[in-house]
């Protein structure tokens, strides 16, 4: 689908992410609570529900640099994706109000594979890894790291 995401697993229950392209490009989130489990050698499953009502389930296969994601978007996000393009942490009550106003259905399911293009160890709980929207990053990101 041409979307480009960046995910930082901060610890065993929390992640930060930012979206570089796609219908919600420049959306970014910190301290998203998630279920993170190892399911095989270098294979992890990460799942969460956002304040928007969006459900996300990811499989990260570091050995094969393969990523599979299933995102369940409520209808209101598909109808007005621009409402979610923000630093979500500053707008959680607003996201909840959008979710409650709906509509939730029909749910849009995005189920796709992707290639993992960049991996690095940034340590645990490093708030500097994802600290701005994608459009504020250097042009040569992530090569500049």
Per-region residue spans from a language model:
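Tryptophan-anchored aromatic micro-motifs
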Residues: 1-4, 145
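N-terminal glycine/threonine-rich, aromatic-flanked beta-hairpin/loop signature
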Residues: 4-38
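Beta-sheet ligand-binding and adhesion/scaffold domains
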Residues: 47-145
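Contiguous, well-ordered beta-strand patches that form the walls/edges
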Residues: 24-62
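Hydrophobic residues embedded in beta-strands of well-ordered beta-sheets
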Residues: 13-16, 43-44, 65-67
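Short beta-strand segments that buttress and anchor functional surface loops
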Residues: 1, 17-21, 46-50
């Amino acid at each position: 689908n041409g979307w480009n995401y960046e995910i930082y697993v901060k610890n065993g229950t929390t992640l930060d992410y930012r979206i570089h392209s796609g219908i919600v490009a420049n959306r970014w989130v910190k301290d998203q609570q998630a279920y993170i489990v190892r399911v095989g050698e270098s294979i992890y499953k990460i799942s969460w529900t956002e304040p928007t009502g969006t459900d996300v389930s990811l499989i990260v296969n570091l050995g094969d640099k393969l990523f599979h994601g299933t995102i369940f978007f409520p209808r209101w996000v598909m109808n007005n994706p621009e409402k979610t393009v923000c630093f979500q942490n500053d707008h959680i009550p607003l996201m909840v109000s959008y979710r409650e106003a709906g509509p939730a259905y029909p749910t849009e399911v995005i189920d796709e594979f992707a290639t993992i293009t960049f991996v690095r160890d940034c340590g645990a709980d490093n708030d500097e890894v994802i600290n701005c929207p994608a459009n504020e990053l250097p042009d040569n990101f992530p090569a500049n790291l």
